[in-house]
Amino acid sequence: MTQTLSQLENSGAFIERHIGPDAAQQQEMLNAVGAQSLNALTGQIVPKDIQLATPPQVGAPATEYAALAELKAIASRNKRFTSYIGMGYTAVQLPPVILRNMLENPGWYTAYTPYQPEVSQGRLEALLNFQQVTLDLTGLDMASASLLDEATAAAEAMAMAKRVSKLKNANRFFVASDVHPQTLDVVRTRAETFGFEVIVDDAQKVLDHQDVFGVLLQQVGTTGEIHDYTALISELKSRKIVVSVAADIMALVLLTAPGKQGADIVFGSAQRFGVPMGYGGPHAAFFAAKDEYKRSMPGRIIGVSKDAAGNTALRMAMQTREQHIRREKANSNICTSQVLLANIASLYAVYHGPVGLKRIANRIHRLTDILAAGLQQKGLKLRHAHYFDTLCVEVADKAGVLARAEAAEINLRSDILNAVGITLDETTTRENVMQLFSVLLGDNHGLDIDTLDKDVAHDSRSIQAAMLRDDEILTHPVFNRYHSETEMMRYMHSLERKDLALNQAMIPLGSCTMKLNAAAEMIPITWPEFAELHPFCPPEQAEGYQQMIAQLADWLVKLTGYDAVCMQPNSGAQGEYAGLLAIRHYHESRNEGHRDICLIPASAHGTNPASAHMSGMQVVVVACDKNGNIDLTDLRAKAEQAGDNLSCIMVTYPSTHGVYEETIREVCEVVHQFGGQVYLDGANMNAQVGITSPGFIGADVSHLNLHKTFCIPHGGGGPGMGPIGVKAHLAPFVPGHSVVQIEGMLTRQGAVSAAPFGSASILPISWMYIRMMGAEGLKKASQVAILNANYIASRLQDAFPVLYTGRDGRVAHECILDIRPLKEETGISELDIAKRLIDYGFHAPTMSFPVAGTLMVEPTESESKVELDRFIDAMLAIRAEIDQVKAGVWPLEDNPLVNAPHIQSELVAEWAHPYSREVAVFPAGVADKYWPTVKRLDDVYGDRNLFCSCVPISEYQ
């Protein structure tokens, strides 16, 4: 039959690229699970009362090329002015070797959080380097592997200060008046839920205030002044007040380390180490503290440990502090950091080394000195005598200066009374400085850069002598070797090949949705139109961003069944926090602020109770029945017991147990009956899109993990995005922003992230995904995700029982394999299976969550039947190996499972095992071999001997 032109144009071509199994493979799998079609399968599995009659109207699909052209036209509406606004954001020069070999490399950006250290040694080493940079620059003992942004780090510093404070009755937190306004905004939001009083005043007046448990100072103030806080910190420490200092990472190259001045906590943004501004993010924050406070620190910490052979190996240390274990008692609700961005900053430091970084920092400071000298020579007054890269210039005709700046396509900071702020950066040239002279002084200023340079080179007093760093930084060999592009490229490749990412194999992690991050989706994030905008630029310069964000928000509204979407939260955990704050403020607006009880099912992810606690709520756990569903009887009893104090329930759908609960609408009705709100965790949205929606089910608010369902890559542990969808009555209570008015959001609430739209520069990824898939593709993606999970469950259930199923023995988009009977029978654990899968070339499924002794498998729609069969064959082969142990062929203490994973060096070492080398490293004829570089890690050793800085190179050899 002759095809029509429309058929030949094939606007839905990307759908077939994104979805792994083709039509024939889908039919084979449907036959295997006993279903006639995708619609028939989802019709059987999804409760009838929540199935959408028609898919959400998000438009027809577009080809990759058409979508890219459409988005390019939108991006072109952004105006790329040169921004000297500062306030924690500067233009950067990302070295092309890092751009090409990391940011644009799926071997780096498609990896998952390194819970499985044996397949993560490369990015763990890069993160350890990041921690070493942090330690050297801050002068402290312990560093984390990044936080979400500088403002969030400030809020975490406040919370940590309270945890470690010996002044248990003190309830006030002091913030110096010259911290960045967005930092203060986020601190105030967090303080409100904790019940802390925030005092904002001149730093020198801090001792005038009583009952202060912690202080936040900023080493280089928001308008540029360098502060020597040595004496003040000493006085504060004598009064047992915990001192946190916000610092500029580039300034720290030249300035004395706050830790050496006595600070307890030091944090800041690593953005200017090579990460584009991106209209606000994503960026990594650094965070360091004294050794005595290490168990109270938030976020990931990479530690040096040993593997089973006694060799040096890296791992995430002290995970017992974190939300997935401690739940509401966790130090923080954060379950994602900013690994990809931290690693860019880390490798920026490696590539430039201490000499290169000092050259960059000195050049920035020299140009600032030259600018200052010229302006003062012409009679303008600087508000601060001591500065690094930022001048606060008093101007008589401020309107005229700003008009000339706009005409020259320059952004100055304009919110300072009778003055403008100018922040220079590594991209600033002498031509830029001459242009600034013209803007501030007029064209006939007569100044000469070289003459001014000679003057300031011999007589610069803009950094106090006491504030100049007198110690060496970055002395470890890793920062002093890889300075040619060839060496750097090879170093990065050596790290990459240690890790297992989606470019090598499926990552079947339950509750993580490790789907395709298509190249076409990733391309726009490095476009200058998106990458180079300052988050606080005038809104008329960001019309492209505003259009893209508005379109994406509109699509998400339609896909979720909500009335509004807030894009600010820059992780799923931040989304939970923002959604719960919206509920809290809604109740307060109705004079029901006493509603503070949050019901959470026993199966919930640990982030849920941690977020509830952060939001000032009390957690009450609701039981699950023997089938893993919410126990309605217990729910009613707990809701009735809470009564007028019921705030909300947090529920995941499909459930964390991997099934569509039949009674989800009844759950919503019970909570609403008692005046509560329904928070539906969007972690499993990949099984809802196009089939049902949170709003249709009856929920009031959800966060959406754009890094799961909507294709933003996990980056090895971040970035993520967690926008929240809300019903109309909650819309006035979503986060606002003190610096930028968010168009279309009538909210006066505080911010939860530093930038108004969170990590805005990765939103084009989700825009591209939805645009290319269209309504039909999005629904089909959900259906194939469900098919793939059921195919795995049906083929593995005889070897590994599926713990929970719904109607007709079906699962949703993931399934839980119960290893407990096998462990009781043979002694082989889920950990042994997880590590043995590495020998077969796979990342392990999620271990012991949500049920201890299990493996949770989520294949996603992007995996082909060939890859699914490869995984299934590996699992069945492992089951056969377990049977060998059971039969006594291999002893329990010496077999391929308990010794897994196996590494190359074992092949040439003495072999004393009762199984062959071939069985060890080429099981079941594995062809495309992934080689881990370390054996199983010793977790106990790692936590007992915590060491979070770089080790000698010899340890890696």
Swiss-Prot record:
Q: Which residues carry the post-translational modification N6-(pyridoxal phosphate)lysine, per the record?
A: K708
User: Which cofactor names does the annotation list?
Assistant: pyridoxal 5'-phosphate
Instruction: Show the GO cellular component annotation of the record.
Output: cytosol; glycine cleavage complex
Q: Does the keyword Coiled coil apply?
A: no
Alphabetically ordered keywords of this record = Oxidoreductase, Pyridoxal phosphate
Instruction: Report the GO molecular function annotations.
Output: glycine binding; glycine dehydrogenase (decarboxylating) activity; pyridoxal phosphate binding
Any idea of its EC number? 1.4.4.2
Q: State the source organism's domain of life.
A: Bacteria
Query: If you read the UniProt record, what top EC class would you report for this enzyme, in one word?
Result: oxidoreductase
Listed under GO biological process in this entry are: glycine decarboxylation via glycine cleavage system
Q: Which NCBIfam families does the record match to this protein?
A: gcvP (TIGR00461), PRK04366.1 (NF003346)
Binding partners and assembly: The glycine cleavage system is composed of four proteins: P, T, L and H.
HAMAP family with a match to the protein in the record: GcvP (MF_00711)
For this entry, the protein name equals Glycine dehydrogenase (decarboxylating)
